[in-house]
Design a protein with these regions (language model features):
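Single conserved hydrophobic/aromatic residue that forms the stacking wall/gate
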Residues: 1-10
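A short beta-strand element within beta-rich, extracytoplasmic domains
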Residues: 27-29, 117-128, 192
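Extended, low-complexity, turn-rich repeat/linker tracts enriched in Gly/Pro/Ser/Thr and Asp/Glu
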Residues: 35, 127-135
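Edge beta-strands of jelly-roll/beta-sandwich modules across compartments, strongly enriched
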Residues: 35-46, 198-210
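Disordered, acidic Ser/Thr/Pro-rich linker "stalks" and the adjacent N-terminal cap
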Residues: 43-114, 130-132, 155-156, 165-168, ...
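Short, surface-exposed beta-strand/strand-loop-strand elements in extracellular ectodomains
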Residues: 132-145
Length: 210
């Protein structure tokens, strides 16, 4: 065991930096002498043992692997981060769904991996989306380090295409392999474009961290 922060005087709310930044798996909070707290949040980065970095065939674009949603232009019916979940979709609300577009254009979102990766298979699941799945979608990637999310969002329109526009069907799993994937370059961020709108339940990138 090690102490990551000493005794803190409570305020409403209170925030502080940890005394060290070593990887950890568990947190214990001690109240002096008693009382209650409403929320505890620990901010940081997902850390993965080196032995797992070269393991092939994992979903590098999942919350379990440390991926996160940065931005979506529309999350009217469901959050973009839902498509990173490991568990099977529970309902339409468990996916990412945008409102019907009345104006030109398409909906899109930006995702970040926990570390650089390469992909060999892409899976898109439209489970539960029957009359409201996107007609087509495409994927783009970029290798970015030490940039603010705001600048990443702005630059995403010019990223390298990973998958050209592909048709989607209702309530089914779609798989795209090496013959569909345009490049095998290492990347850290993904942009998904759906045309024109709609919902998907899950997006998986099967590959390896490098």
């Amino acid at each position: 065991d090690r102490t990551v922060t000493g005794v803190q005087t409570c305020a409403l709310p209170i925030s502080f930096e940890c005394a060290e930044s070593q990887p950890l798996t568990h947190l214990r909070i001690t109240l002096h002498p008693d009382g209650g707290i409403a929320r505890l949040r620990a901010y940081g980065e997902f850390w993965e043992e080196e032995r797992d970095s070269n393991f092939d065939g994992i979903n590098v674009l999942s919350k379990e692997s440390g991926a996160r949603a940065i931005y979506a232009n529309d999350e009217h019916f469901g959050c973009l981060s839902n498509i990173l979940e490991k568990h099977e979709p529970l309902s339409m609300a468990d996916g990412w769904e945008t409102r019907r577009r009345r104006e030109p254009g398409n909906d899109w979102g930006v995702l970040a991996l926990s570390k650089p990766a390469q992909v060999e298979k892409i899976i898109v699941d439209t489970k539960f989306f029957k009359g409201n799945f996107p007609h087509t979608f495409s994927l783009s990637t970029a290798y970015i380090v030490n940039e603010e999310d705001s600048s990443i969002i702005e630059s995403s329109q010019s990223w390298t295409k990973l998958l050209e526009r592909q048709k989607l069907g209702m309530n089914q799993i779609h798989t795209f392999d090496k013959k569909d994937i345009i490049h095998n370059e290492t990347f850290t961020h993904v942009r998904i474009d759906i045309y024109p709108d709609g919902g998907i339940a899950r997006l998986k990138f099967i590959g390896k961290f490098v």
